[in-house]
Amino acid sequence: MAKVRAALERIRDPSVQTALSEAAYTHVRPVLKESLVNCPYALSNDEADCLESFGITVNPYANQTHTHAACKVIENRMLEIVGMHLPKHSCTMLFLKRSKLRYMRRAAILKDVFLNKDVEPKDLFRYDRDTIRSRLQDIDTKIAYMSDTLHFMSRREIVQLFEDSPKLETLLATVVLPVEALHKRTSLYPSLYSINYSAKGFEYIPGNHGGGSYFHPYTTLEWLKVRMINAEDFHKLSTGFILTFQLVESLGANHLFIVQKAKLLTPQMRTFCRDSLVTLPQVFCPAAMNANRPLSKTKAMQMLLYCKSVKQVTERDIYAKIRQIIPTSELELYDPDEIVHLANYFFFVSSLDSITCYEDLLSSDIWMRLTRPLRTAVRKFVELFKGKQDFDKLLIALKWQPFSYSLEPVDFTAYFVSRRVRTLAKMEDISWHQAAELARRLESEPDLLSWEDLCSKPIADPLASVSTPPLATLTSPAISESRVTDTSSPKLTNISVESILHPTSSNHATIAESLNPKFCGWTRGDFHHMIVNQPSDRLKGCRSWSYTTSPDVDLMLENLLLTPIPWESRLSDILLTLNTPANACCIQILDCSAASAWVDWSVQPIKTFPVAFVGMGETTLTFEDDSTLPLKEGEFVFFPPEWLARHKYQIKTASNLHLCATFLVLDTTLLGETLANNCIEPEPLRPTASRKSCQPTPSVDKSGADSPPEKQIVTPIVDAAVLSCRPKLQDVTKPTKVLMAAETSDSVADSLPWASWVNLLQKHGFKGNQQQIAQDGQLIIPISDIRKLPHIPFPEEVPETLRETLKNIKRFPVEITMQHKRAGSYDSDIKNNRTGKLLSQMDNKWKAAFAYKLQQEDRKVCGTIIHGCGGSGKSFAIQEWMRSLKEDQSVVTVVTPTVLLRNDWQTKLPILPADVFKTFEKSVIQPCNPILVFDDYTKLPPGLIESVVMHHQNVVFIILTGDNRQSVYHETNPEAYIAALPEAVEIFSPYCEFYLNATHRNVKDLANKLGVYSEREGKLKVNFASHHLKASRIPMLVPSTMKRNAMFDMGHHSMTYAGCQGLTAPKIQILLDNHTQFCSERVLYTCLSRAVDRIHFINTGPTTGDYWAKLESTPYLKAFIDTYRDEKTEVYNSQPASAEPTEPEAPATHFPTAPKPLLEPLVEKLTDKEAREIFSPAFGHSNAIQTEDSVVQLFQHQQAKDETLYWATIDTRLAISTPEANLREFNMKRDIGDILFMNYAKLMCLPPEPVPFEERLWKISADEVRNTYISKPIGNLVNAASRQSPDFPKNKIALFLKSQWVKKTEKLGTLKVKPGQTIASFMQETVMLYGTMARYLRKMRRRFQPDNIFINCETTPEDLDKFIKSQWDFSRPAHTNDFTAFDQSQDGAMLQFEVIKAKFFNIPAEIIEGYIYIKLNAAIFLGTLGIMRLSGEGPTFDANTECSIAYNATRFHITDDTAQVYAGDDMALDRVSIEKDSFNRLEKQLKLTSKPMFPKQVKGDYAEFCGWVMTPAGIIKHSLKMHASIQLQKKINNIKESARSYALDLRYAYKLGDELQEHLNEVEADYHQQSVRDMHLLHQQDVLNKGSASPPHVFEKTADANTAGSSKTHKRNALKKKKQTRIAEILPSPDATGLSSLPFRFF
């Protein structure tokens, strides 16, 4: 082919080349057209290259977008391949939409059958409703196709599909499973998809877009290994069959399998990709210190040759080479430790000698040849002791092992339920097990009953019309519909939470004593016949058999899935004796004198039925607390499922071939059948007299006759005390039920779920006899978060009185691990002054000694964790014990998080010295006693507890009290290590045995709203106001530190929500503002739980529905808001309506005639012309105040020819610097620019990853810039001829003064002339290049710009009007900025922001460097300018706008629901934004400053933007500016040319009519009326009514000779028209870089 190509390239004849191109096009065109079917999407280069490597043709002109286009193309290609394999007749399509047929190239005439099933919620919208089936069965075609669903199904379901479809022979199935997930490797094709791994499975993310991701358990990867499935009948009624799997095609993670119902040959290996990876040998010890992950062999060879080609390789050289050979796009595929191990391996290899240490054969004499074997043997013997030489070590280290993704297929076995059994079960409404028994009887006794008899129509019942059957049964006729609960069933009345979770705190000393074995009468002989010739699974010390009622029931022991065996009738008989349901039974035969492994049922999906354990021999059950329960033969016990979820047991026996059975009720798989009819239940027992109390009371109708009793539903036989969740009380009419004293203890135990904990509640000061309801309707449990922990003895240093005190409240010592890493983090922050106040002031020697003492391993210390809500008395018992101590005690030290809490302890224990109570920093510096009490430890810095315990080695016992529901410590310094540590409550909560959810502080109403139990009587009083309580020292709680400081300065006793922990007050004030909605539940719980019975809410925020909705989203605060509203509603409803008539509203009137003249107040303030002009000794006065007309003199007329104004503008607006100084400033402020961009990116919703460069969009932007420039008048092009020259310096600026009338409202009638504005004219090529960059970045920005941000660029006033009406919120003050010297203040930080933004959008590096160059070296005739914004540099407007956005995003907290408008240096927000605390440090490093203004958004005080006033009715022009501009145009005789433009702007206010009365004050209304009158006099009424659709008015051509300056203007214009104009040809500049895609030359 190369010779053919070379021959074609030698052809130079244009006609022949044209003919060849046309011939090639005829071949290419149909290919491209066909490729659009599978690939209609626009692809990146990497995606297109990857697809072409798969043999998939892509169309480079496709323009559709998709979140995962490449993976979608592969899916379409797979469908095409499937279509090639399918025959041209009807087939069945499973899990496929009809619209996919076009990708398979199949016509509708084939009449394919579609069968789908709803598995996920999105399937409800994916498939056509007429194709949905409740069960996939009865496939009538020989061939079927299953689309991308096989990996979500189990092997059992596929086997069942073939069994239920006898005609089905071949199944084509596609799966989406990345083979690299078998090894937990990164994606083989990162441009197509990525993979996230977790403990439960992995996430397949096509197109790296989370919206299309799928989660797979690791077990689904077994589909890649399946070769054959041996299908066997679960009930042994029919012969099985074999399914053969063969991989037909593999494209990335998509694979196509053919499943044939036959035993066929398949390849021995299953190949997915070429082997290109190797694993490096292990050369270091331990094995984990080696580079164990596969590496590309090419990269490994590159590294080896580099290490051996460099004279002396250093560690840094190796890291540099690794960075060089790994592309930037692949860096995320490597882990840091992997790179380190890789570098160590090659550094080790580089240090070994590669010159052979063996002798050569050519120079050996006869003596050496004869003695060579001996010398070789001696050498090997010496190496056993001395070690191998470097060359041998090198060869061993270079034995790379190939790493392959190829698999060896595996055979599996799966069970199915025969079609006959399913049919019988459905016809007779019986379980599969019963149907299987019936089928066996049909086969064994065909004369007695045949299959046809079952299928025939049933005979009518002659007794159906009889009201009472002659022989009524004593029990319910159907088990499946109703069942009478037998009270003799194994209810766990003897098993309680106290006895199981905390056996030492109940009447039973151990778990074993709390269980009550019973006798069932079954022996080992009753089971032996069942397990003969049945497959068993070998486990530790035993053999196991798994009997299940369905193959869908999976039973697992010791992480091994047991082989299912069909249910035996003998097991159903045993269930009758035990009176418990079950669908699984595990039978175990233990070896003699052996003990089984610890049995853990927590991995099983056990339902709420108890688990029955039956022992058939002398058995001993051993529990975690070392207690034992002996069982005799035939005895059984019940375990509640809640207990099994947390505990394990072990089976021991001394008898030979001991047998035991465990009965369970388990759930099924995701796509399996439900177990409603597959659960074996015992026959119902007849109620006896002893059970009358358990029977429902029959209802009585109006006639007095008893109505039939309702059917009883089978309920879980579990005592209420072991329920892990609070019961939902549907019929509670009162929030509290108090048990009377006359009730017995048994009735108390029956009515209270926490009956076994009442004694503990009483020891904490509660009666514990009330049922209280939380705000959500749930029963409040006073004891929660119960854990079973192993106890350890108290240390000898703990006094006996403290031991008894803790035991009395059921707080026992446990072993707590103090992590040295947490202590080290706190120590590092102290050492480097990142946290702390007192400790950071310690000298360096103390800090060094402190750090040295903490350099140790984890320390285990004895301690007790006490958790409880506020006011529960967590520290009461400890304080009572401390009151008994002597004054000079040296036993205990109390550590508190705040001074307030320390003073509280000292007040309650005045007898003890003050040094016993320390704040947390003092506890580090000063010595501590052996017993440490950390009160409210959740507010201590992370790592401090560990640091104190490790620092004071004499500490042997610690007590931690706190509330894990309240706020925790917050580190304000993000650089501190402890800011990234888990909270202390997360570390120590697992060591707490229970949580006391009861309080003495809050009244019952308040506590119940917080979900807390309380017995304190009283009424909760809640009131709202917009102000605080004056002349009051009631504590005020505020959401932010800023508000707290402000309130404190005003004399209030203020605290933050999170910082009020430890406060208790009868009444509190809570300030609600916009920050409240962002507070967490912990913070609000802390805040609301401070009061006893009165709360005063202060609402300083808006009262809109959105605001209340946000506050109501907080569960705790919603309860108080609802309470307040209910009280207000009652007050309003109790007040009758006033009988007096109301006065009607006044009608809207037309605008009155405005007084004249309106501008006179401004004219009166004017002084003489000379006093207002700027004076220069060199050039005299400026000439900005022109004519003698006083109205014209209100406006400054800045002209380019005014030398005085020109030099005054240069002195004011420009700053002269040097390139070196500019570069220094740029480097010094890079960090600030980075912060600006990060805030900008967050506000503008930019993606997390950089955006690829789009060459096509760049070309479009370049064409727009070029067309805009060429569309200018020829005269303008000729005047700029010098700047079009390639000899014009790239960094030079031609400086001009901008000619303009100054019409800004704030500068109207300014007494002193202000400097003007400069126009900086760069080289034309420079302007067009960076104008292109600005347009490109503008287009890219719009893709991500959120809807609540409006940028007034390439928009119309109509767009702005729509935005204001739809997005702007006028119910709150607005926010605008008045920047000072905006252009001159854009320094190096802003330049870095622009550079980072350009890099983020992947602007070519040479363009960015060129932009930096002109910004740092911009020069005028006076020298190099400082870094600033110049008006003619190309991206002026866009850059100004972006810098304004970045500045505001960095300075203020701008929420997502804030409407924002930007244009250059003009901006406005529809809410007042709070300044960030971090801006205090940034403000000094930014030149740019601004003065925020806050319009109240009421009549006369609305926000302004680009000359428009934003009102609730829409935008209107500023009345004063509009009127003054019209008067100016009238005075200079230019009104006729500009009247239409002014009328179009005025129309937005004019069309509002009388509604303007609500938005304009009296003065503004006068200006507006006069402007409208002027427009009517100028015949612009049609424009005011119809807008731009009205035709322009033609004025008569008249000249006003008396108007100043008008005759000169007309003469000058006429003279210009007569001048002959030169034509200049603009040639494109050559492409200096070779990048033909960019239209301008780079530098």
From Swiss-Prot:
All residue ranges annotated as the (+)RNA virus helicase C-terminal domain in the record: 997-1132
GO molecular function: ATP binding; ATP hydrolysis activity; mRNA methyltransferase activity; RNA binding; RNA helicase activity; RNA-directed RNA polymerase activity
Record field: compositional bias (Low complexity): 1136-1155
Catalytic activity: RNA(n) + a ribonucleoside 5'-triphosphate = RNA(n+1) + diphosphate; ATP + H2O = ADP + phosphate + H(+)
Transmembrane segments: none
UniProt feature, compositional bias: Basic residues: 1608-1620
All residue ranges annotated as the (+)RNA virus helicase ATP-binding domain in the record: 828-996
Bias-annotated ranges (Polar residues): 690-700
Entry keywords, A to Z: ATP-binding, Helicase, Hydrolase, Multifunctional enzyme, Nucleotide-binding, Nucleotidyltransferase, RNA-directed RNA polymerase, Transferase, Viral RNA replication
RdRp catalytic domain ranges (all copies): 1372-1479
Domain of life of the native organism: Viruses
This enzyme's EC code(s): 2.7.7.48, 3.6.4.13
InterPro entries xrefs: (+)RNA_virus_helicase_core_dom (IPR027351), Alphavirus-like_MT_dom (IPR002588), DNA/RNA_pol_sf (IPR043502), P-loop_NTPase (IPR027417), RNA-dep_RNA_pol_alsuvir (IPR001788), RNA-dir_pol_PSvirus (IPR007094)
Keyword Zinc in record: no
Positions of ATP binding: 868-875
Coiled-coil positions: none
Biological process (GO), any one: mRNA modification
Chain segments carrying region Disordered: 686-711, 1131-1155, 1587-1620
Functional summary from the UniProt entry: RNA replication. The central part of this protein possibly functions as an ATP-binding helicase.
Family, similarity comment: Belongs to the potexvirus/carlavirus RNA replication protein family.
Protein name: RNA replication protein
Origin species: Narcissus mosaic virus
